[in-house]
């Protein structure tokens, strides 16, 4: 049987090491200790070689060992391992049965871990992925080699790095290879590289064995049957619903004075606003009631959890007391055994003393017999006595050695018992320490949850207060605008009333009218016909341009598309006849529907408002004499013109009426007080009133008189109407193109993933402006909090021109069921942005 060399003495055949050089360390044996250090006996079971030791074995050769500075390869290796950059590893597909402590220990086996970030959901539950940061790139490579596809429970662990980290690892490996090649002398051959590779493999095997031992220790937890397999979908839906209620509460609990329905009715406001406020208050109260019920349920659950925790503490206390009693009984048994052994030793000593006395008596009898013998045998007796004394002394020494051996065995047994008791005490201390750590962890976890809930509540309260203040300011501004509108309408009505009361046809007509109204209208008619002809030519050119664009885009039937666009424009040009004024709610609903139709792919475009034109009265310095036909009319006669100089068609003059499509459209916005239209409700939008309704009071007076002719000056509104019409047409065309582009994008996953994407358009500007904000918003919706690392990972996959299926496989480890919907929406957004940029819809 061979034994390892002494720890503080060099083995035979190997010369002693120089001073200051540590002795070599053998695998499976502890390092040597300095002389004079008290030694504690270690059982043989502890001294057995462990396979998890990471220290490489040193091959001992029969030559003198040099100092550490004579090994430049080892020194360069240590420098390379210490100067590498820190790297981050993505760890996903973590089983729910695997505890966070197991994952931390597995990651720590591969190297020095700087940080381990396990993502938590809004409910506090650990997600199935995390990010580990290693101090050395060698640790990252070892984790990729050993932990990827490692079976933990029912899932295989996923360990990978992004493109940026992979580039860092490749650069570090190239740098390490170059530095190793420069550090080695020229006499080193490829055998050293092969030996280094063998050493790396040997270290990987040792770490792999340690990982297997660790998984065997946690096998009871990993192989435990799942108790929630049947109710898992239902529980998941319930957790998601609770998460939504937790993240988006309707209102926090703030003591406000109770507002009754009578108080609301007492406030002067419109009926629809009063109903809206009543409904909001009812919803608020219902939500408040639901929140109170949820709070009561959560309080009961917290009390049950606290009760279970106290039960566990009492159970641990009873277990601790039971172990103390067991140890006390064990110590009593040890003391009884010790007393029994003491009595046995006392009996042995008595037997020894009895034997000694018998020997003394025998010796005394021998001496008496010797004295009685004759004198001639004195010499013989002397020799015999000498021999007998020698034998006696030999027997005495033998008995002394036997007693010494017995005492040594007794001391050895005592030391063994003392070591056993020490091990028991260490185990008890370790068990108590683990229980205390578990209790402290539970307390910290509960405190962290309470802090997170309090912070979330404060955040929701702050957002709600900001929203309420904003709404209050909006209501105040709206009231001020409404008051200003009423004042303007009253002022305009008063001014118009004073103007019409003071107007005299004979005196004031020369200031505002000149020439023949018929000739003026004929000239206006010719100008309108020329403008219509120009408009027709421009319309034909625009239609031809749209047709050429559709052909360039590869539209299957451009003529049908042009016909459809013309029908749509014709339908919009037709006037809408309103039999009665619509209520405010109907107008708001129509406005909301129109805004929803105008939002393609989450882009809002504000509709362009047509300019509201007011009638302009321009005085004339000099005018010719009024014709005889106009002299017969009175100022209050309702004729073909209004007193303000605006032409009003009459049923008795059909030759002067123009066709509907060639009549100039003039937008007239008049502000009247409440006295002119008492039955009409206040509206947010200004409505165009017919001219007859403004001047209907003149039709009641002198209706039998002959209508008089007046000299009129046409109103010149400039190019504003044309620009507004052109802007509206451009907006409509853009909206149609966006709608047709969205319809062309496939919705099914196979066709969508097979769609050819123009990667040359996908650049960093498009990623930062459109894609990244959308991805960040969706990640917050799915996970419950912002995760910049995951957003960077998805953006890097897109910028690397990865296929959508590969991105879906990677993201499925994190988002589970929502991954497919997320990737489909993201890919549709990519296709839309590239196609829109290609045809010039967006810049």
From Swiss-Prot:
Gene3D superfamilies: 3.30.70.330, PWI domain. Keywords: Acetylation, Cytoplasm, Isopeptide bond, mRNA processing, mRNA splicing, Nucleus, Phosphoprotein, RNA-binding, Ubl conjugation. The modification Phosphoserine is found at residues 226, 229, 583, 677, 683, 703. It is found in: Nucleus speckle; Cytoplasm. Residues 12-30 have a biased composition (Pro residues). Residues 621-630 have a biased composition (Low complexity). Residues 674-683 have a biased composition (Polar residues). GO terms for cellular component: cytoplasm; nuclear speck; nucleoplasm. One of its GO terms (biological process) is RNA splicing. CDD domains: RRM_RBM25. Residues 1-30, 171-202, 219-243, 280-442, 498-688 are annotated as: Disordered. The keyword Heme does not apply. There is a cross-link at residues 261, 273, 430, 578, 671, 688, 697, 722 (Glycyl lysine isopeptide (Lys-Gly) (interchain with G-Cter in SUMO2)). RNA-binding protein that acts as a regulator of alternative pre-mRNA splicing. Involved in apoptotic cell death through the regulation of the apoptotic factor BCL2L1 isoform expression. Modulates the ratio of proapoptotic BCL2L1 isoform S to antiapoptotic BCL2L1 isoform L mRNA expression. When overexpressed, stimulates proapoptotic BCL2L1 isoform S 5'-splice site (5'-ss) selection, whereas its depletion caused the accumulation of antiapoptotic BCL2L1 isoform L. Promotes BCL2L1 isoform S 5'-ss usage through the 5'-CGGGCA-3' RNA sequence. The PWI domain binds nucleic acids with significant help from its N-terminal flanking basic region. It has an equal preference for binding to single- or double-stranded species, and it contributes to RBM25 role in modulation of alternative splicing, maybe by mediating RNA-dependent association with LUC7L3. This is RNA-binding protein 25.
């Amino acid at each position: 049987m061979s034994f390892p060399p002494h720890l503080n003495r060099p083995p035979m055949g190997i010369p002693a090491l120089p001073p200051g050089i540590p002795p070599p360390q053998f695998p499976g044996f502890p390092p040597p200790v300095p002389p004079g250090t008290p030694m504690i006996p270690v059982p043989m079971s502890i001294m057995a070689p462990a396979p998890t030791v990471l220290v490489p074995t040193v091959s001992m050769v029969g030559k003198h060992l040099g100092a550490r500075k004579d090994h430049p390869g080892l020194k360069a290796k240590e420098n390379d391992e210490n100067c590498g950059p820190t790297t981050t590893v993505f760890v996903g597909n973590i089983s729910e049965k695997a505890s966070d402590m197991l994952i931390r220990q597995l990651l720590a086996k591969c190297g020095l871990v700087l940080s381990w970030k396990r993502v938590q959901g809004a409910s506090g539950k650990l997600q199935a992925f995390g990010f580990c940061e290693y101090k050395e790139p060698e640790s990252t490579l070892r984790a990729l080699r050993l932990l990827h596809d490692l079976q933990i429970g029912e899932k295989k662990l996923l360990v990978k790095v992004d493109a940026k980290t992979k580039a860092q690892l490749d650069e570090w490996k190239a740098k390490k290879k170059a530095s190793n090649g420069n550090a080695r002398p020229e006499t080193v051959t490829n055998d050293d590289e092969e030996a280094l590779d063998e050493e790396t493999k040997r270290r990987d095997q040792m770490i792999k064995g340690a990982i297997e031992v660790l998984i065997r220790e946690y096998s009871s937890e990993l192989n435990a049957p799942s108790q929630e397999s049947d109710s898992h979908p239902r529980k998941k839906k319930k957790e998601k619903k609770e998460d939504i209620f937790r993240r988006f509460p309707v209102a926090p609990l703030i003591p406000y004075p109770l507002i009754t329905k009578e108080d609301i009715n007492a406030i002067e406001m419109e009926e629809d606003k009063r109903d809206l406020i009543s409904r909001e208050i009812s919803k608020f109260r219902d939500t408040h009631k639901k929140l109170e019920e949820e709070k009561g349920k959560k309080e009961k659950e917290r009390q049950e959890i606290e009760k279970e925790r106290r039960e566990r503490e009492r159970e641990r206390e009873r277990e601790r007391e039971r172990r103390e009693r067991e140890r006390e009984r064990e110590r009593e048994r040890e003391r009884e055994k010790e007393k029994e052994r003491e009595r046995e030793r006392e009996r042995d000593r008595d037997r020894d003393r009895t034997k000694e006395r018998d020997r003394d008596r025998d010796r005394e009898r021998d001496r008496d017999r010797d004295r009685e013998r004759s004198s001639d045998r004195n010499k013989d007796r002397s020799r015999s006595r000498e021999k007998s004394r020698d034998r006696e002394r030999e027997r005495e020494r033998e008995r002394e050695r036997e007693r010494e051996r017995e005492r040594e065995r007794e001391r050895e047994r005592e030391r063994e018992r003392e070591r056993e008791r020490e091990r028991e005490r260490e185990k008890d201390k370790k068990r108590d320490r683990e229980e205390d750590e578990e209790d402290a962890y539970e307390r910290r976890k509960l405190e962290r949850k309470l802090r997170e809930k309090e912070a979330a509540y404060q955040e929701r309260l702050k957002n709600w207060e900001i929203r309420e203040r904003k709404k209050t300011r909006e209501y105040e501004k709206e009231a001020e605008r409404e008051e200003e509108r009423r004042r303007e309408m009253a002022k305009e009505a008063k001014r118009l009333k004073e103007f019409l009361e003071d107007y005299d046809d004979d005196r004031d007509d020369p200031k505002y009218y000149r020439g023949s109204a018929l000739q003026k209208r004929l000239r206006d008619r010719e100008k309108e016909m020329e403008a219509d002809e120009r408009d027709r030519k421009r319309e034909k050119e625009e239609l031809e341009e749209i047709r050429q664009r559709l052909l360039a885009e590869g539209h299957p039937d451009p003529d049908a598309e042009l016909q459809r666009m013309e029908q749509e424009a014709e339908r919009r040009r037709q006037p809408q006849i309103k039999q009665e004024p619509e209520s405010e709610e109907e107008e708001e609903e129509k406005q909301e529907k129109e805004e929803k139709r105008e939002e393609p792919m989450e882009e809002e475009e504000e509709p362009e408002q047509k300019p509201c034109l007011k009638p302009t009265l321009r005085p004339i310095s000099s005018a010719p004499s009024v014709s005889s036909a106009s002299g017969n009319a009175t100022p209050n006669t309702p004729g073909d013109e209004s007193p303000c100089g605006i032409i009003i068609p009459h049923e008795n003059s059909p030759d002067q009426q123009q066709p509907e499509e060639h009549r100039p459209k003039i937008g007239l916005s008049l502000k009247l007080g409440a006295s002119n239209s008492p039955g009409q409700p206040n509206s947010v939008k200004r409505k165009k009133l017919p001219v007859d309704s403004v001047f209907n009071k003149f039709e009641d007076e002198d209706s039998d008189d002959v209508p008089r002719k007046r000299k009129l000056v046409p109103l010149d509104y400039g190019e504003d109407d044309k620009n507004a019409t052109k802007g509206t047409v451009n907006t409509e065309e853009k909206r149609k193109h966006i709608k047709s582009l969205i319809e062309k994008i496939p919705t099914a996953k196979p066709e969508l993933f097979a769609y050819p994407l123009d990667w040359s358009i996908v650049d960093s500007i498009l990623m930062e402006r459109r894609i990244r904000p959308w991805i960040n918003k969706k990640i917050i919706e799915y996970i419950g909090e912002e995760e910049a690392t995951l957003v960077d990972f998805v953006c890097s996959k897109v910028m690397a021109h990865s296929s959508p299926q590969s991105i879906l496989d990677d993201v499925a480890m994190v988002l589970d069921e929502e991954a497919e919907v997320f990737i489909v929406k993201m890919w549709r957004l990519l296709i839309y942005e590239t196609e829109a940029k290609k045809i010039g819809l967006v810049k």
